[in-house]
C-alpha cells in the first residue's frame, strides 16, 4: 500500500510566516530563511519510498505558486485551525498510511520519516515530539475511519499541544519517534546553526 508524506507549507511572504523568528532577524529575512529551508527540506524528503504531497496555504495562491517544485502534487489546506486542516488532510488522502510534517524542521531526514512509517506497522498513530512540547510529525495508519474528534480542543503553540493531541485519539495505540527541534525564534535558529556545525552527517 502506498505511503503518503504531506508537507504543510505557507507562501513565504514577509510578515505572514515565521513571525516570531522575524522579531529577531527581521520579517523579510525570516521569510527568506523559510523559503530556502523548505526547498532544501523538500529535496531531502522527496523519496521513492513514499509519495510526497504539498498541502499549501493560502489555498488559491499556493496551488499556482512557482516557488515550490511543480512536479509535486498539491492540495489546499483549507480553513480552520491547525487541527481542522490536519484532520481534513488525513481524511482526504488516497488509501495508505499518512504522515504530516511542517516545513520548519531543518533536522529532519529521510531516515526519520522511514522510522515513522515503520512504527505505523505496529501502532494506529505516531508522533514525532518537538522540544517545545509540540510535535514535528504526526502519522496515522488509517485502516479504520479517522476519529471525528481528532485534534479538537488542542492548545496549539503551547507545551500542551502533543499531550492534548494524543488525548483526542482515545483508545488508538500511539508510537513516538525521536525528538527534533523546530525553528520558531532567533534562539532556535542559533541552536540549529550550532548543531549543524558539530553534527555528523546522517
Q: What residues fall within each predicted segment?
A:
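Short beta-strand/loop segment that forms part of the nucleotide-sugar
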Residues: 50-58
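Conserved alpha/beta core of the MobA/IspD/sugar-nucleotide pyrophosphorylase nucleotidyltransferase superfamily
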Residues: 160-202
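Short, glycine-/small-residue-rich phosphate/pyrophosphate-handling segment
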Residues: 143-166
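Short phosphate-binding loop-to-helix
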Residues: 64-97, 158, 168
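Short aromatic-hydrophobic micro-motifs that form the base-stacking/packing surface
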Residues: 99-101
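N-terminal nucleotide-binding beta1-loop-alpha1 segment
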Residues: 1-20
